[in-house]
Amino acid sequence: MINTNDFKTGQTIKFNNQIYQIIEFLHVKPGKGTAFVRSKLRNLRTGSVIDHTFNAGIKLEPALINKIKMQFLYSSQEKYIFMNTQTYEQLEINKDQLKEKLHYLYEGLLVEIIFYNNNEILTISLPDKISLKVTYAEPGVKGDTKTNSFKDATLETGLVIKVPLFINTGEKIIVNTETGLYLSRDNNK
C-alpha cells in the first residue's frame, strides 16, 4: 500500500477503479485541522488530469505497471503496429487508444508502451522531444525580423504547429511532445 504521506512524482496508484499517475503533489499542514495532500493525477486510461485532495496518512493500492520499449513500424487503417525491440513480437494498438499522440508517430520512433497487469494497454510514452521534418511552411520574407514572429508549418506526421519565420520547407525541427511547441532547429539533420 502507498501512504499519501509518501507520494512521489511518477508513482502509479489505483483510485476510484482507475489507474492514475501522480503528476505533482503538495503536503499541507494547516494551523488548525488535519494535514492533507493536494495532488494532480493523470488517468492513464483516458489521459485526463484531475486535482484531488487526500487526507494525510490514507493508504492507497499501488498500480503495478510494465513499460516495454517498442518501435513504431506502420499504420494500417485504424491500427498502429509496434514491435518489441527485444523479442521482435508485433503489437497492434487501436487509433482511439493513441489520441493526441498520433501526431508524433513516425516510422522507427522508439516509444514505451505502458501495460497494466501485463495485458491491458494503458497508453504510450513518447520521448520528451522529437525531430520532425517540415513538409510545408510559407516562405519567410527577407527583412521580416520582428521578434516573436511565427507562422504555421506542417510536419511530416501531419501536425501543424507555429514555427519562427526563418524555418523553411525541408528543414528538421525539434518539437516538445508534451506541449506540441517548436523548440529549435535540428542541427543533426
Curated annotation (Swiss-Prot):
What is its pathway?
Protein biosynthesis; polypeptide chain elongation
Q: Which GO terms describe its cellular component?
A: cytoplasm
SUPFAM superfamilies in the cross-refs? Nucleic acid-binding proteins, Translation proteins SH3-like domain
- Which residues are in coiled coils? none
What are the cysteine partners in each disulfide bond?
none
The cellular location(s) given in this protein's UniProt record come to: Cytoplasm
What's one Pfam family the UniProt record gives for this protein? EFP
- What broad class describes the main subcellular location of this protein? cytoplasm
Q: Could you give a GO molecular-function term held by this entry? A: translation elongation factor activity
Q: Does the keyword Signal apply?
A: no
The domain of life for this entry's organism is Bacteria
Keywords, alphabetical: Cytoplasm, Elongation factor, Protein biosynthesis
According to its UniProt entry, the protein's GO biological process terms are: peptide biosynthetic process
Record has Cytoplasm as a keyword: yes
- What is this protein's function per UniProt? Involved in peptide bond synthesis. Stimulates efficient translation and peptide-bond synthesis on native or reconstituted 70S ribosomes in vitro. Probably functions indirectly by altering the affinity of the ribosome for aminoacyl-tRNA, thus increasing their reactivity as acceptors for peptidyl transferase.
Protein family: Belongs to the elongation factor P family.
Q: What is this protein called?
A: Elongation factor P
Instruction: Supply the gene name.
Output: efp
